[in-house]
Amino acid sequence: MFNLDNPFWNTVSKLCDLVILNLLFVACCIPVITIGSSITALYVVMRKKIRNEGSSVVKEFFKAFKDNFKQATIIWLILLPLGLLTIYEMYLMTWVELSSLAIIKYVFFSFLIVWILIVSYVFPVAGRFDNSIIGTFKNALLMSIYHLFPWSILIVGVNLLPWFLIFSASGLKLIYIQVMCWIGFTIGAGINSFIFEKIFQKYIDAKEESN
């Protein structure tokens, strides 16, 4: 019963790792400015977990957080104001009923879609490949478009579903928030990590063949 190598305790250990990782991620996102490096570290650790690599979740998270802090923070500080500005402009336009603004609304909506795609890809890409900030943005955008159906749509769906549930289900709002705070982010990152590994491996194999 207390054999730590049996399936039951292995499952308990993995669940504990997911909870610890989720709590670390949430705590490190609180300063806001560190959200980019926190997302990157989350995906780095989740990739190692699904590949059965690495050891301590805490050690691996803070190592990835530190290693990617500069680049991921710069990327986040570029994306954050762009996203907020786009959402704010779209909100203002909902109060204006002018046919002449219809095209502008579509432009902002299209930009928001591109922004969501980039945010969904750029931090996992930053944690997987060594590249410049511009190169990371470029690769994230191209990958998200190239793999739009079905992978990018699925990734975005996994990312947005919890927020949709939180903001749409008032009666269960607190329950959804608690789930996200305890284990929700790691579950989402885990699902997406399987997809990203499938996507990234194609580029890794192609690079190895070219060499």
Regions flagged by a language model, labelled:
Residues 1-108, 115-211:
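Helix-coil boundary and N-terminal low-complexity module in membrane systems
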